[in-house]
Amino acid sequence: GLGSSGSFGVGILHAIYPNATPEFLAKEATRIQMDILNNPIGVQDQYAAAYGGINVYEVNKNGEVKISPLKSYAEWLRLIDVLEQRLVLFFTGLKREANEVLKTQKENAEQMEETLHNTQKLCYNIKNALDEGEFRKFGELMNEHWQYKKQRSPIMTNPQIDEWYELALKNGAVGGKLVGAGGGGFLLFYTEDRERLIKAMPLQHLPFKFDYEGSKVLLNGPHL
């Protein structure tokens, strides 16, 4: 649920092609996963790994991706200072195959299309909230997104996940969601009472930081 397969693919390609552009890395990693491995995935994980930062990705019908950075580097530093304090990630301990969840979404195509249209509209509202520094609204929109996401698949959530989600809302979370395909993995919450939420949740807390640069090659030795 943390984009590990996309990050792994981008990292391997960057090791093979150390001078490659982020665009090449993202496109090639996506092509390998979709066309060669036949995984029913999107493009966001590969592009996030290649480019870094917080971006809006607009995917055209022909597969071309337009990338719009949310902030300049100076603005980015101010943004992540808030988000890294107010976004809290927990591991549910529940594991699932992302392909299994994504397959059920494809089988429910009509419902899936409707929720994706709603999610697309929500994306621009989220962008505006972050641009304007309306962080609480951002948290509320996370909750709205989770309500749409649950409609995509009958195995997106389960009673245990729903119980943890409600517990978080009762202990300072404004909104949240399962990240990734769903069905398990990690829960991400926005809160203005970080310590209260961490103390209340019976799950492993995973600290994290944002990255602005994307995939990098670390040179170690004269022959690289």
Functional labels for PLM-detected ranges:
Residues 185:
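Conserved glycine-rich beta-strand-loop-beta hairpin in the small C-terminal domain of fold type I
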Residues 18-22, 27-40, 44-177, 188-224:
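C-terminal nucleotide
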Residues 1-2, 151:
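A generic structural signal for short coil/turn motifs at secondary-structure boundaries
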Residues 2-22:
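DPxDG-like acidic metal-binding loop motif
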